[in-house]
Swiss-Prot record:
The keyword GTP-binding does not apply. Pfam families: Conotoxin. Belongs to the conotoxin O1 superfamily. Disulfide bonds join 54-69, 61-73, 68-78. Delta-conotoxins bind to site 6 of voltage-gated sodium channels (Nav) and inhibit the inactivation process. GO terms for cellular component: extracellular region; host cell presynaptic membrane. Keywords: Cleavage on pair of basic residues, Disulfide bond, Ion channel impairing toxin, Knottin, Neurotoxin, Presynaptic neurotoxin, Secreted, Signal, Toxin, Voltage-gated sodium channel impairing toxin. InterPro entries: Conotoxin (IPR004214), Conotoxin_d-typ_CS (IPR012322), Conotoxin_omega-typ_CS (IPR012321). It comes from Conus consors. This is Delta-conotoxin-like CnVIA. GO terms for molecular function: sodium channel inhibitor activity; toxin activity.
């Protein structure tokens, strides 16, 4: 019984993890080539060259603490210790 409950929780967690970390699939594979050509013509349009702003304290950060200005994400919220 306990093993069954643990397996159900693990499957639900992994399913949620897949949805949270998945890329936006609306573009699909058919649009990858035009985007790549555009990025080759204009290297500044590349995602790797974009600078993202950090999230302030109290904002939702998901599972990536690097998005917070303080680099501290606990329970999906950016925190700051002072």
């Amino acid at each position: 019984m306990k093993l069954t409950c643990m397996m159900i929780v693990a499957v639900l967690f992994l399913t949620a993890w897949t949805f949270v970390t998945a890329d936006d699939s609306r573009n699909g594979l058919e649009n990858l080539s035009p985007k790549a050509r555009h990025e080759m013509k204009n290297p500044e349009a590349s995602k790797s060259n974009k600078r993202y702003e950090c999230y302030s304290t109290g904002t939702f950060c998901g599972i990536n603490g690097g998005l917070c200005c303080s680099n501290l994400c606990l329970f999906f919220v950016c925190l700051t210790f002072s």
